[in-house]
Design a protein with these regions (language model features):
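NAD(P)+-binding Rossmann beta1-loop-alpha1 motif at the extreme N-terminus of oxidoreductases
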Residues: 1-51
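Short, well-ordered alpha-helices that flank and scaffold nucleotide-derived cofactor binding pockets
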Residues: 17, 21, 87-91, 114, ...
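Generic structural signal for residues in well-ordered beta-strands
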Residues: 26, 59-60, 121, 174-176
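Residues at the C-termini of beta-strands that transition into short coil/loop
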Residues: 30, 49, 61-64, 103, ...
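Rossmann-like NAD(P)(H) cofactor-binding subdomain of soluble oxidoreductases
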Residues: 52-137
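Internal alpha-helical scaffold of NAD(P)-dependent oxidoreductase catalytic cores
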Residues: 91-92, 115-120, 135-238
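NAD(P)-dependent Rossmann-like dehydrogenase/reductase catalytic/cofactor-binding core
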Residues: 219-313
Length: 313
């Protein structure tokens, strides 16, 4: 199976490195200094799960036409780069290609369908914390690394099961689910609500927890996600809210999301995932007739967050 990793950031490099080490027929779509470093020294992976090693893919490049059609593509770009990514990826997509997006956001397949040639677009999630320490060097620090994927309509293609098997043999836990909609919403409820809270209070988890009645506010924020999901026919487990509150209580005080960090580092709103993570929830709330005041306020504040932030406990 010819597999392409499109987007060699923290997620793409983690998966790509594992597959390359396992001898999979894997290719990297990579540009700039990252590509230069990998061509010269190989991809350096430092992982709590996989260990420390260097690998080279079967091939890499930055021109989609040079790869030919792929059997499977993992899309691991930033949400704000989705439109350009689909455009650049199109030459590698055939009628039988399966595309698995591993982006922040919920049910990204809905956004991709109008942008790609006819193919099979799944949805996917991954539980991992990884980042590029420097060009050509990915560091994975936490999370199980588990990939969950599936077609939104529950009609999963055999190639998804083959892909899951390849991932597992490479050391990455993987599962094909008949209910990817719930898994996608659950991950979004965690990541999206965290991002909303950090933007809303302009600070990390420790600052949020020091607010008066903070647990009430946190509960209201995650309830907005649960209610919008319910309007789309996705029912969360009854224990989800309490589990989320317990998890938020346990976060290290300096915990932030990549969206909040990007905003505080001074990146322009359009160069971050503000629209994918916060703006889309506001839009879905309006479409469903569900009030989402916490997310609306967080979205408004996100465009104002430009000052560097410090660590708080």
């Amino acid at each position: 199976m010819r597999i392409l990793i499109f987007g060699m950031g923290g997620i793409g490099s983690f998966i790509g490195g594992a597959l390359a080490r396992a001898g999979a027929d894997v290719y990297f779509y990579v540009r700039g200094k990252n590509r230069e470093a990998i061509e010269k020294e190989g991809l350096h992976v430092t992982s709590e799960i996989l260990g420390d090693f260097k690998v080279w893919p079967k091939g890499m490049g930055q021109d989609g036409k040079s790869f030919g059609k792929m059997d499977a593509i993992f899309l691991a770009c930033k949400g704000n780069g989705l439109i350009n990514a689909c455009r650049d990826m199109a030459p590698m997509v055939g009628n039988s290609t399966v595309v698995v997006p591993l982006l922040n956001g919920v049910l990204v397949s809905d956004l991709m369908a109008p942008l790609l040639p006819p193919c099979f677009i799944a949805d996917g999630t991954i539980r991992v914390f990884s980042h590029m320490e420097k060009p050509g060097h990915v560091v994975q620090t936490a999370g199980s690394g588990k990939v969950v994927m599936g077609m939104k309509d529950g009609k999963n293609r055999p190639i998804l099961y083959e892909l899951a098997d390849i991932l597992q043999k490479a050391g990455i836990p993987a599962e094909v689910t008949d209910d990817i909609r719930l898994d996608s919403w659950e991950k979004y409820a965690l990541m999206g609500t965290n991002s909303a809270l950090f933007c809303l209070f302009d600070g990390p988890a420790g600052k949020v927890r020091r607010q008066e009645n903070y647990r009430k506010i946190v509960a209201e924020a995650v309830e907005e996600v649960i209610t919008v999901a319910r309007a789309q026919g996705v029912i969360f487990p009854e224990t989800y809210k309490e589990n989320y509150l317990a998890l938020f209580d346990s976060l290290p005080g300096d915990t932030v999301t990549s969206l909040y960090r990007d905003l505080k580092d001074g990146k322009k709103t359009e160069d971050t995932e503000t629209e994918m993570i916060l703006g889309r929830m506001v839009k879905m709330g309006k479409e469903a007739g569900v009030p989402v005041p916490c997310f609306e306020k967080a979205y408004e504040k996100a465009v104002l967050l430009t000052r560097p932030f410090g660590r708080e406990g």
